[in-house]
Amino acid sequence: MGVASSNTAAGGVVPGENINNDETLSNNNKNNNNNNNNNNNNNNNNNNNSSTTTNLLVAADTAIANMASFYQSTLSDDFKLLASENQLPEDLDTFMETLLFSLNFSEESNHNYVYGLLNELSKQLVSNNLKTKNFNRILMHFINKLNLFNQQLITISESMKKNKGSKQQLILDQSVEIQLYTHQQFLVNYTILIQTFSKYIIENMDHVNIIQQFTGDSENSFKTIPFDLILSILGFLSNELRDCSYDLHDVLLRFILILFSTEMYLPLPTIQENYLTDTFTVDFSFYELLAPKTNIFLNILMDTVYNNPNSPIVYSFIFNLFNNIIENKPPPSTSNSLLDSIGSAASYLLLLPLNAYKYFFPQNNATGNSMTELSTFNLLVLVQYNYPKGNPFRKILSNIQDKDFSIDLLNSNPNNHQIRISMQQLYESIIKSPSSDKNILLLYYLLQENSFFFRYVQSRTDLDNLLLPMIQILYNSFEEKPQQVNMILIIILILSQDSLFNENVHSLIVHQILWYKERLLIDVSLGGILMVVLIKSIILNLSKLRDAHLHTNCLAILANLSSNISHIHPYVANRLVKLLEILSKRYIKLKKMLNQVDSPSKINTNNSNNNVKDNTNNITQSMSSVSISDDLSLDVNQLQQIKNLENHNSSINKHHNESHNNSSFLNSPDLNLKELQSEELTTHSEFLYIVLQIINNTLTYRAYSNPHLIYSLLHQQEYFPVFLNEENLSSLSNNILNILSYFSSELKHAINGLSQQETTAETIMSFIESKSKSLPVPPPDQEGILRFKYEEESTSFEFITPYVWSIIFNYSGEKWDTKNITLFPTVDLTTIKSPSVIDANNFTPKKQLSSDQLHSPPTNTTTTTTTTTNSTSSNTILNSMPIPPPNTQLQQQNNLRNQEQNQEENGDEKDDKIEKEQTTGVELSSTEKTN
């Protein structure tokens, strides 16, 4: 009750009173001069009372310092009543004011003790709530108070808009400011209390008990509490962010994130659960929960927005989230003039809730405390949710317009429900940290859903600021962060669908890349750097991870980039040819081994099961044996090490491998050899087709601007005759061979009369450049240009949902109880001395899958038409295979990393020689001359 009396003495009102703002603003503005005349008298009175105030504050500070030792006694009366078997008094206003303004935690208090105390109170409250309905009553009381404060802010805002242009409209009456400040701090503490109880319920109960706790067991008066709670929070957050409501915005964004966190404590839905027709039947007065394992608050919000797609509250809420992301407004400092005007004692009482707020959400914590981060987390949760009827927030996201695009603004109807933001400011906010997990996911959804943002990104001339940090992640963290790598590849694939992007990245020159360790890259185009890293990723994936999803995405990006390859750097050209060499060796080796397996002499019909297993293991070894070196086989011990790792991981991740074995490279010993042959040969044939198509298109249409690629191919043309007998590869190989034969023949005649000293790399490069310009360029064949387009799969939530919530788990600044989280694996921080955050990129969702269900990244990459001059038409659809269990990948990587690096260094010796010839003028050998 202390705050109520203090507010009255200070000229304010208790939380819950209405404000006649127009009259109050007018009357108090008239009294401004009188208030100014009384300032000196007030200062004198303050000086006279300084001694009393000092004594009061000293006593208060002493009480705070000792508060941790007697929480049970000082706060037990009200809290014990709240959590007991007895019902709360009818006058909740008085009871909650006394309880909430007693919440004060000093900065030195023991956090574990406080959280333990609150958890114990939550446990007692929940155990008695079905009988007492105390939690339901304070929820309804909180909703009413929040709605009342929301209405006060709306009234003040409308009043200030009416007085716009007046000199006095910027001056908020001091008594109104005091009341708003008091009411906000009251609701801040109220939110913290409700959030604590709600969080305990969500973390420790199943969906049925959660619904019972929030709606009551039998009383219809509480049935709409979850709906009313979500609607009231959404209504408040739809208001403009102001200094007088900043703290409450902050805690409500955290609170709604807690309510949505039921998704962390439920397994991913099965196909049958995913396509339930009606998850909720919502009415404003009553609703019924139908679905099992339902995310109650997310479904309520989705159903509400789905049934009211043009709700201005929803659009204002989303608009404010984007505004928060763009502006990242810092928390306001407490006004000294405000505290001075109400006296030190009263201001201390008003600061009690603020101290509790700072205790639970300390601003010195580096994670999860900015308004940008909280808004991003909430936005990601909303757009990623797999709502059976279709996520309405993704539709809202797709309709957001660029307010800087004047043409659309002139043609648009201001009465339409539309969101307009600055795409420039949003883009600049994202590229401040383009490689962070939350920004990568936000960028993915914006590029995928919003055409305005997509067009704006394509128009930027500084794409290196966006792409280089992502490319660096692909280079440095390809093995350690598979989820993040997959999202980056998808983002680049979406961007590469536009020819303007491909043209820009190939024309943008990066002068030096310091983080690239293999070579000193100087004056390489951004597109060239991207190609080099993608090729390195493919080679690494072939030798270790063997994940076809990564192959598909990397090759699709390379294919899209190939339509604009120009003045390719020697090192980039060598790496592209190296990729062709490795794929060719794998293809030849695999085909040879499969022919041996298919031979009757290799199969004993009396012992078919054993032979199938042995032969499959041999094929697996042959696939792994083609390393990134020039050698055709690995050491036997190395092959056995790979095999042991696969067997070990298979036993650890049995339920995950059930869904992966059908699509991983030769993981299943029981796989029928005929099916294996068809699958693996087809996959490698498709990969080779793409690489050959890239080379063929470049030589056919842009040979004059890529002499370094021709030079590199002349060193490795022995692989092309191998594919002349392959049905889908023969036309491409034949066309490439014809072009290379032309250069070889012309080169042979040109150097016949030259001495060995005169036959330098510079001479040969000059000759290639001259001859390439004389090659006839056929008319562009649109059907022959490789075009890959990204399409999101219907099961993409299986990949993204755990990813989103693991990021929130790590970076929201919230203390989560890990023992019941089922969406992704966690570490019990209480059992280790130096806890580290859960890696958001290395987890496997805890989901019970049937054998025919796949866990895969959200990719479905297809080519439309892929033909070239002198080649046959072919519509190719790359097989989408799931990502292997991340822990399987990591164990392989940790054991083979050093070995693979040594092999790559040895395998690149020939590339070094070719590149050195191209760049320094070293002479070709006689054998290379004749080729």
UniProtKB/Swiss-Prot annotation:
Keyword vocabulary terms for this entry: Lipoprotein, Myristate
Residues with a covalently attached lipid (N-myristoyl glycine): 2
Top-level taxon in the UniProt lineage: Eukaryota
Residue ranges, annotated region (Disordered): 1-53, 599-618, 839-931
Database matches in InterPro entries: Dymeclin
Cited Pfam families: Dymeclin
Bias type Polar residues, positions: 839-858, 919-931
GO biological process: Golgi organization
Residue stretches of biased makeup (Low complexity): 27-49, 601-618, 859-876, 889-901
One GO CC term on file: Golgi apparatus
Protein family according to the UniProt entry: Belongs to the dymeclin family.
Protein name according to UniProt: Dymeclin
Gene name tied to this protein: dym
